[in-house]
Amino acid sequence: MSLRIGMVAGEPSGDLLAGRIIAGLQARAPGVHCAGIGGPQMAARGFEAWHPMHALTVFGYIDAFKRIPSLLSTYGDVKRRLLAEPPSVFVGIDAPDFNLRLEHQLRQAGTPTVHFVGPSIWAWRYERINKIRAAVSHMLVLFPFEEALYRKEGIPVTYVGHPLAGVIPMQPDRAAARARLGIDADARVLAILPGSRSSEIRLLAPRFLQAAAELVRRDPRLQCVVPMVNPQRRAEFEAIATQHPVPGLRCVTAAEGQGETPVAWSVMEASNAVLVASGTATLETALYKRPMVISYVLSPWMRRIMAWKSGQQRPYLPWVGLPNVLLRDFAVPELLQDEATPAALAEATWQALTDEAGAARIEARFTALHQDLLRDTPALAAQAILEVADGAA
């Protein structure tokens, strides 16, 4: 009988990752059948999708509340199918709110479970470790320090590296990126990434734009380039930009990035420095070896929730940006909340743009980080999944 694997991915990044893992599984176990919830990358590998990936996609708390009936219906159907015909192993890829609950019920019923992409318990809500311990037979993690964390907690774990490290080149080509974007080869370029969510753009864009205006005042030749994930976010950003004008500001979307490289990556690669919202984009910037200033601002009500939670639980890491977390150091500046004033952002970013010796040092540190994260992620993940399935056979 062929190997059957249940699988749920809830976001495009998870779909891309899962598609590569399925390819790794097929190379090691011909005839393997994977089914559950997934997207086009998984479908291209023969994945049987019971529900489309967007069935799990929500945008903020209001949307999540509205989607509760459909989410519960999807959850119930997937759980029923997997309990009726238990797979050899179930693999949940990210989407922890959905997958950890499902994994717990499947594991109680005797199905081994693997969870890929550990929740950021090291940054927020560490108490989730108890839920993970009960739900997950084996964790697959992206970062080296996570492996030690889960081992300490008695949870079987495999460090498989970060897939971005295998996609982003070890040696970026600034000239090629500028050619793709139509930017002068000798220009000084600042990439501005205020986030991909409406709430992030609303809170960060005014500060980033005011900082950029000050930087252009200092150096009128400076080119500020803003990549946007889609036309909707671009329209939101440009509406704010009309209130905070920056001479020569350029906003680009995917069609202008030319080629398969995400437009944000092209802009990072083309830049001399990056002013970036905390999130995955900070890791992408580090893999492109660019100096950066990391910033983030929460809404007032979210700040109150975070302040309350920080008083209830153990203290967290002193760093917010992923590059600093991974390097265990303030390798690049972080300006958060009230510290994220336009003046402070401008000063820190000016330093990133003009300090050539500092740029060389950070390039060396980010190159070492890139090498540390570079593994054959699909192969390692596939091997671990098959070992869990074999152990349960």
Swiss-Prot record:
The gene is lpxB. Condensation of UDP-2,3-diacylglucosamine and 2,3-diacylglucosamine-1-phosphate to form lipid A disaccharide, a precursor of lipid A, a phosphorylated glycolipid that anchors the lipopolysaccharide to the outer membrane of the cell. HAMAP family: LpxB. It catalyses: a lipid X + a UDP-2-N,3-O-bis[(3R)-3-hydroxyacyl]-alpha-D-glucosamine = a lipid A disaccharide + UDP + H(+). GO terms for cellular component: membrane. Pathway: Bacterial outer membrane biogenesis; LPS lipid A biosynthesis. It is an enzyme of class 2 (transferase). One of its GO terms (biological process) is lipid A biosynthetic process. One of its GO terms (molecular function) is lipid-A-disaccharide synthase activity. Keywords: Glycosyltransferase, Lipid A biosynthesis, Lipid biosynthesis, Lipid metabolism, Transferase. NCBIfam families: lpxB. Its EC number is 2.4.1.182. It comes from Bordetella pertussis (strain Tohama I / ATCC BAA-589 / NCTC 13251). Belongs to the LpxB family. It holds the Pfam family LpxB. This is Lipid-A-disaccharide synthase.
